[in-house]
Amino acid sequence: MRIERVDDTTVKLFITYSDIEARGFKREDLWTNRKRGEEFFWNMMEEINEEEDFVVEGPLWIQVHAFEKGVEVTISKSKNEDLINMSDEDNEQLDYQVNDLLSQTFDQDDSLEDLFDQRQQQKDNKQNQDQNERNRQNTRTVIVKFNDLEEVIEYAHYNNQVTDEFEDLLYSLNNVYYYAVHYDETVDQETINDSYSQLLEFAYPTDKSEVYLNDYAKIIMSHNVASQVRRYFPNTEA
């Protein structure tokens, strides 16, 4: 902890979070535990008094700034003339003043941490999405989602892919249909990507994996799904 004497009534200190832990306090305690927060503050005041002969008498004006590595605290005492009319009740409010200030400060710091965590989570999600997209572009299996049977039928009547190049499965889960296509090793990646793009004209991307679908969904069609759908649901407009 670094202490700087500003003048007769004001001191400034900076304490790192590692210093806080070295004194036997957890950072979380300072804003979740009233008793520990007050204990921490008065321990700091004892050190300040020992080093700078800064005796606490009467109300304090405290300003706290939370930084990435620690906390800066500026403490100012009332001038002598301010103490004349000070009551015992004013003294009793000092502990509450200290605790409330610590609570507000570390709540603010906690909010900053939450914001950092949120941004980090967004960054991680973006990285995961990018990785999933790269994986999709290099996989021989694609999975899409149809919101209802009508979308499946519409796609089936449009699709005219050569069926010996892939195997496919149609799953049903909670009235939603998932279509998985396994492409043969002879199919190049560009063709797979083009087929996926065509699928997305009728279907939607999904984060459901084939392992998940095998565990929780029901296979209702397999092997040349589009042909089966056309057979069961012929195009009456033709």
Swiss-Prot record:
The N-terminal domain probably binds unfolded/aggregated proteins; the C-terminal domain interacts with ClpC. Residues 120-136 have a biased composition (Basic and acidic residues). The gene is mecA. One of its GO terms (molecular function) is protein-macromolecule adaptor activity. Belongs to the MecA family. Enables the recognition and targeting of unfolded and aggregated proteins to the ClpC protease or to other proteins involved in proteolysis. Homodimer. Coiled coil: none annotated. It comes from the Bacteria. Residues 120-139 are annotated as: Disordered. Pfam families: MecA. This is Adapter protein MecA. InterPro entries: MecA_C_sf (IPR038471), Neg-reg_MecA (IPR008681). It comes from Staphylococcus saprophyticus subsp. saprophyticus (strain ATCC 15305 / DSM 20229 / NCIMB 8711 / NCTC 7292 / S-41). The lineage of its organism: Bacteria, Bacillati, Bacillota, Bacilli, Bacillales.
